[in-house]
A protein has these predicted regions:
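Short polybasic linear motifs
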Residues: 1
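Acidic/glycine-rich phosphate/pyrophosphate-binding loops and surrounding catalytic core
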Residues: 13-166
Length: 166
């Protein structure tokens, strides 16, 4: 197995191709579970070609994680969506910060938003907690490592979040 550098220095013990397959599977499964054959409210109320935008607004301070994952979700749902970022994975954010704006069809934004919010909240919480442990151990020879004890089905993003946190 190769050690590869992915998504802002994320090192894992699988190939880049295998990691990307895991991320793609997480996204496809989550969208299928959440939306199925479509968000019926959006399909009924929002014209197919209606354009829109959204922003990710920070509600608490900590380490932001999952920006690169969010870009992949948006691209999966609608390849033409555009994301304008103001922070990078691993940056410290505080209440009121705007992490990114996303532009695309309103239906596609709504289709992607629940997965993006859930994943980024979880990844940011893990990254923030990891950073606190890393800071506590600064000056020692101790290193924070992740384990295999992760949530089935989303292991790749949880391990990614640990790496982002430190």
């Amino acid at each position: 197995l190769l050690i590869v550098n992915l998504a802002k220095q994320y090192l894992i013990m699988i190939s880049e191709e295998q990691f990307q397959k895991e991320i793609d599977l997480i996204i496809a499964n989550a969208i299928r579970e959440d939306v199925g054959d479509g968000d019926h409210s959006s399909l009924a109320c929002i014209p197919v070609n209606a354009e829109g935008s959204a922003k990710l607004l920070v509600k608490d301070e900590g380490i932001i994680a999952g920006i690169d994952f969010a870009k992949q979700v948006f691209r999966f749902v609608e390849p033409s969506m555009r994301v304008e970022t103001f922070f990078n994975d691993g940056d410290f954010v505080k209440y009121g910060d705007v992490v990114f704006h996303v532009y695309g069809t309103s239906q596609a934004i709504l289709k992607a938003e629940r997965l993006v919010l859930n994943a980024m909240q979880r990844m940011s919480a893990i990254a923030t907690k990891t950073k606190k442990f890393v800071d506590l151990l600064e000056g020692t020879k101790t290193k924070v490592l992740d384990t295999r004890k992760t949530t089935p089905g989303i292991r790749a993003i949880e391990k990614w979040a640990v790496k982002i946190g430190g």
